[in-house]
Curated annotation (Swiss-Prot):
Compositionally biased intervals (Basic and acidic residues): 371-380
Upper lineage: Bacteria, Pseudomonadati, Pseudomonadota, Betaproteobacteria, Burkholderiales
Annotated source species: Delftia acidovorans (strain DSM 14801 / SPH-1)
Protein name: Chaperone protein DnaJ
GO biological process: chaperone cofactor-dependent protein refolding; DNA replication; protein refolding; response to heat
Family statement drawn from the similarity comment of this UniProt entry: Belongs to the DnaJ family.
SUPFAM superfamilies assigned: Chaperone J-domain (SSF46565), DnaJ/Hsp40 cysteine-rich domain (SSF57938), HSP40/DnaJ peptide-binding domain (SSF49493)
Keywords for the protein's UniProt record, in alphabetical order: Chaperone, Cytoplasm, DNA replication, Metal-binding, Repeat, Stress response, Zinc, Zinc-finger
Record-annotated J domain positions: 5-72
Location of the protein in the cell: Cytoplasm
Residues annotated to bind Zn(2+) 1: C153, C156, C206, C209
Signal recorded as keyword: no
Cofactor(s) essential for the protein: Zn(2+)
Length: 380
């Protein structure tokens, strides 16, 4: 008989998350528990449970899942996980140990199951906040960071025991690192409270490392900051988190990017914005001005009568984001500056200009006419 699709067995989509897969399996495991299926239904429940267990074992392992997604049942060992017909209801104890172990302080980092020896744990992930400039974010850079790292203790050579002594096998778990607790039909596997999952007890701990077998030191890492990275993005450095337990893999280091405020530019996605001061003479008469960009200077033609707040767009002068195929734009916002500390002669010239403008009426001011109309309406 051909096997059913593993995703169909668990009732989840092919893009289901690990949590969704675990929840679906837990639901089926509870449904087909022997305490809930007696008599004629027991055999069918056993088969359903085995089927769900096999699907869960394949889809909860990232490597097996990838092989299954690519090649189907041919990509995985057809005998793995089912244990043949001789397993019977023994599979319930193991599976429920795995499921309920997660509920009783066994965490998502645990690897291995009942009867598999000492518990193996993946190390915790670490985070590191890194501050860079806008220019560095735009162009990318190679950087070095120093992070705390656990290295083997030179005094005890990683054993955790005082020189001249050795660790002893834990008598509570017999070196397994875990203990089984039975609750009715349930067999719950928990970390040994005496040795904390190591399977060993150290009567005389090393004084240099406190019995941990490792000491914390500073480690220098090379980090490549990709061009276009944005504030809040994270870079993963695999295997540079905390070390695992009992030979488990190390966690990862996540470097979170923080971009410093810039004196000139403000970033909005791939676009940049900046305020450009312009004299009121240039705004009135027009002219060419220089504006800064991240790649140098650029020229803008200011037309006659440019008003404060006018926006000029320089295409392609923004930032090319890490997921973008082309750079954003630079938006220059005009700020018309009013002169200060005028001489008496300059004041006289401005007054003459003012009188001349008054004689011309509202035609010299784009908003003057509408403003006059609004005033009349307000006071009428």
């Amino acid at each position: 008989m051909s096997k059913r699709d593993f995703y169909e067995v668990l009732g989840v989509a092919k893009n289901a998350s690990d949590d969704d897969i675990k929840k679906a399996y837990r639901k089926l495991a509870m449904k087909y528990h022997p305490d809930r299926n007696q008599g004629d239904a027991a055999r069918e429940a056993e088969e359903k449970f085995k089927e769900a267990k096999e699907a869960y074992e394949m889809l909860s392992d990232s490597n097996k899942r990838a092989a299954y997604d690519q090649y189907g049942h041919a990509g995985v060992d057809p005998n793995r996980g089912m244990g043949g017909g001789a397993e019977g209801f023994g599979g319930f104890a193991e599976a429920f140990g795995d499921i309920f172990g997660d509920m009783f302080n066994q965490g998502g980092g645990r690897r291995g199951g009942a009867g598999g020896g000492r518990q193996v744990y993946r190390g915790n992930d670490l985070s590191y906040a890194m501050e860079i400039t806008l220019e560095e974010a735009a162009h990318g850079k190679d950087a070095q960071i120093r992070i705390p790292s656990w290295d083997g203790c030179d005094t005890c050579h990683g054993s955790g025991a005082k020189p001249g002594t050795s660790a002893k096998t834990c008598t509570t778990c017999n070196g397994m690192g875990s203990v089984q607790m039975r609750q009715g039909f349930f067999s719950v596997q928990q970390t040994c409270p005496h040795c904390r999952g190591t399977g060993k007890i150290i009567p005389e701990p090393c004084t240099s490392c406190g019995g941990q077998g490792k000491v914390k030191r500073q480690k220098t890492l090379e980090v490549k900051i990709p061009a276009g990275i944005d504030d809040g993005m994270r870079i993963r450095s695999s295997g540079n988190g905390e070390p695992g337990t009992n030979g488990g893999p190390a966690g990862d280091l996540y470097i979170e990017i923080r971009i410093k405020d810039h004196d000139i530019f403000e970033r909005d996605g791939d676009d940049l914005h900046c305020n450009v001061p312009v004299s009121f003479i240039t705004a009135a008469l027009g002219g060419e001005i220089e504006v800064p960009t991240l790649s140098g200077k650029a020229a803008i033609d200011i037309p006659e009568g440019t008003q404060a707040g006018k926006q000029f767009r320089l295409r392609g002068k923004g930032i090319k984001g890490v997921r973008s195929s082309y750079p954003g734009d630079l938006y220059c916002h005009i700020v018309v500056e009013t002169p200060v500390k005028l001489t008496e002669y300059q004041r006289k010239l401005l007054r003459e200009l003012e009188e001349s403008l008054k004689k011309g009426g509202a035609k010299h001011s784009p908003s003057g006419e509408s403003w006059t109309d609004r005033l009349k309406s307000f006071f009428s």
